[in-house]
Design a protein with these regions (language model features):
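Mature extracytoplasmic/periplasmic domains
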Residues: 281, 317-393
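Aromatic-glycine-rich donor-binding/catalytic loop that engages nucleotide-sugar donors
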Residues: 166-177
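Extracytoplasmic/periplasmic substrate-binding proteins
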Residues: 47, 208-212, 241-326
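Short glycine- and hydrophobic/aromatic-rich loop-to-beta-strand nucleating segment
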Residues: 159-163, 315-316
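Conserved N-terminal structural module of periplasmic/extracytoplasmic solute-binding proteins
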Residues: 2-112, 127-129, 175, 254, ...
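Glycine-centered hinge/linker elements that transmit conformational signals in sensory
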Residues: 188-189, 226-256
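Short helix-initiation/N-cap motifs at beta->coil->alpha
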Residues: 77-85, 180-187, 253-266
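Hinge/lid segment of periplasmic solute-binding proteins
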Residues: 104-158, 293-295, 365
Length: 435
C-alpha cells in the first residue's frame, strides 16, 4: 500500500474501528500453506454486523486478498432488514466468514450454532498462532482452558493517557510520564484543575463506557457457574472509588456531558484524558492548534501493572461453510505480518507480538510525528476475567450507569453496587425467560 493511499485510508479506518495457542512460534503467525487447488475460483462471503463502507470494504478486504489470492472473490453480506445473521441462519445462508466484537460475539454465534473449532484448519494449513498476543486470543474464548479456538483476533483497541501540553506549560506543571499510577495522576489532576482568566480548566477526565466494562483489574460481572451478578466486591469498590475521586476534585466534575470528547479535543479545557484510540479525531484537533502528547495508561498502585482489557475484533469461519480452507486463508492473510504492519502504520494496534510491528504504530499518520504514540501499544493489556458469560454486556452497561450516578449524582458506592447487582440479576432472568 503506497503512502498516499495509506494516508487516505487511515481517517476512514480509524472512525470505523472506534465505533468497534497453537504452538510457540516466532514474530507472527505463519500463513496458510498453498493447496493443490489454489487456482480454482471460489467465492467467500463475509458478514460484519456493523457493515463496511464500500471504501473500507475494498481497501481492508478486497484489495489485499485479491493481491494475495486472485482466485478468491469476496462478497460483503450486509446486515440489513431480512439479512441479519439470525435471518441468514434461518435461511441456511450463513456466510463463510463472520466478524464480531469480543466475547459477546463468541457467545452470540455459539448460541446460533454456527461456530466450529478452527484448530483443525490451522493445523491443516500450517498456521502458527504463536505470534498472536495471547491475551487477545483468549479474550474470544468462552473457556480459557478449552484448547479449541472458535475465533481469531484481527484487531484490538487499547487506551492511553492523552494530555494537553499547552495547559501544562501555561500552569508550569511537569508533563505526565509513562508508567504512572492512578494515585500519581490524581495528584497531578488536583494541580491542574482551576479557573484562569474566567475559563474553567479540568485536570482530568476519562470515558467510563470503556474503563468500566474493560476494567484493568479483570473483574468479572457475573458468576458463570450460577449466572448471578457478582459486583458487590472489594475489587469493584476499588475501581469505583479510584475513578470517582477525580470528580471530587474542586472544579473537576463536569456532570453528565453530551460529548465527553469535545472538552479535550475542541475546547482545550481538559489537561489529561484517559481514553481509547482517538488518533483520527486528533487530526482535526492538531490542525486547530491542540498541542498534545500521550503516555501509557496509568495503573493501580496495588494491582497488576496492566492497561484495560483489549477491545478485540474477531474473525470466525462458520461451521456450515462449503469453502472452509479458502475462508481460513483469507483470515490467515489478514493476520499476516504484512497486513498487520500496514494496519499498524495507519493507527490500528496489531494483534501480533512482534516488536517491529508495534514500533510501526501510527507511522503513516503525519500528525503523530514527534509524539510518544508508542505508549499506546507499550502497556500490558489486562486479561479477560476468569468468569465470562453471555450476560456480561448487559452487566457492563448497568455498571457504567451506576458509576455515573456515583460520580455525578453523589450516590454511595455500596448502594450503587447493590442496586447494580439487583438490576443485573433481574435482566438476566428476563433474558432467560425469552428462550
Amino acid at each position: 500500500m503506497n503512502k498516499t493511499k495509506r494516508t487516505a485510508l487511515l481517517a476512514a479506518f480509524m472512525v470505523s474501528v472506534s465505533v468497534v495457542m497453537a504452538g510457540c512460534g516466532g514474530g507472527g503467525p505463519k500463513e496458510a500453506a498453498p493447496a493443490a487447488e489454489v487456482n480454482k475460483p471460489v467465492t467467500i462471503t463475509v458478514f460484519n454486523p456493523s457493515n463496511y463502507s464500500e471504501y473500507l470494504w475494498n481497501n481492508l478486504w478486497v484489495e489485499p486478498i485479491k493481491k494475495k489470492y486472485p482466485h478468491i472473490t469476496l462478497v460483503h453480506v450486509k446486515n440489513e432488514k431480512g439479512s441479519s445473521l439470525a435471518d441468514l441462519v434461518m435461511a441456511n445462508r450463513v456466510p463463510d466468514i463472520i466478524q464480531g466484537s469480543g466475547i459477546k460475539s463468541t457467545f452470540e454465534y455459539n448460541d446460533l450454532g454456527i461456530l466450529d473449532d478452527m484448530t483443525p484448519l490451522m493445523k491443516a494449513n500450517g498456521f502458527d498462532a504463536g505470534g498472536i498476543d495471547p491475551v487477545s486470543l483468549d479474550s474470544l474464548k468462552i473457556d480459557k482452558k478449552d484448547a479449541k479456538i472458535y475465533g481469531l483476533p484481527v484487531g484490538q483497541g487499547h487506551a492511553a493517557l492523552y494530555y494537553n501540553k499547552d495547559l501544562f506549560n501555561k500552569f508550569g506543571v511537569a508533563y505526565p510520564k509513562d508508567g504512572m499510577n492512578w494515585d500519581e495522576v490524581y495528584e497531578l489532576a488536583k494541580k491542574m484543575a482551576r479557573t484562569d482568566g474566567g475559563v474553567k480548566y479540568r485536570g482530568f477526565d476519562f470515558v467510563a463506557d470503556f474503563q468500566i466494562p474493560y476494567n484493568q483489574l479483570s473483574l468479572p460481572f457475573v458468576d458463570n457457574k450460577t449466572d448471578r451478578a457478582n459486583v458487590q466486591t472489594d475489587g469493584w469498590k476499588t475501581v469505583f472509588a479510584a475513578m470517582k475521586r477525580f470528580y471530587d476534585i474542586d472544579g473537576n466534575n463536569p456532570g453528565a456531558l453530551p460529548n465527553v470528547f469535545n472538552p479535550f479535543l475542541k475546547d482545550k479545557t481538559v489537561a489529561m484524558f484517559a481514553v481509547p484510540n482517538i488518533l483520527s479525531p486528533l487530526i482535526e484537533s492538531t490542525q486547530n492548534g491542540l498541542d498534545w502528547d500521550m503516555v501509557t495508561l496509568p495503573t493501580f498502585a496495588s494491582g497488576p501493572k496492566t492497561g484495560i482489557q483489549p477491545v478485540v475484533s474477531g474473525l470466525y469461519v462458520s461451521k456450515t461453510s462449503q469453502n472452509k480452507n479458502e475462508a481460513f486463508r483469507v483470515v490467515a492473510h489478514l493476520l499476516s505480518e504484512e497486513i498487520q504492519t500496514e494496519r499498524s502504520r495507519i493507527g490500528e494496534p496489531s494483534i501480533l507480538k512482534k516488536p517491529e510491528i508495534k514500533k510501526s504504530f501510527a507511522a503513516d499518520m503525519p500528525h503523530t510525528k514527534g509524539r510518544n504514540v508508542i505508549a499506546f501499544v507499550s502497556g500490558t493489556p489486562a486479561p479477560s476475567p476468569s468468569s465470562v458469560t453471555k450476560y456480561d454486556s448487559i452487566a457492563g452497561t448497568e455498571m457504567v450507569k451506576k458509576f455515573k450516578e456515583v460520580a455525578f449524582n453523589g450516590k454511595d458506592i455500596n448502594t450503587a453496587l447493590r442496586e447494580a447487582e439487583e438490576i443485573i440479576n433481574k435482566k438476566i432472568d428476563e433474558e432467560k425467560a425469552k428462550k
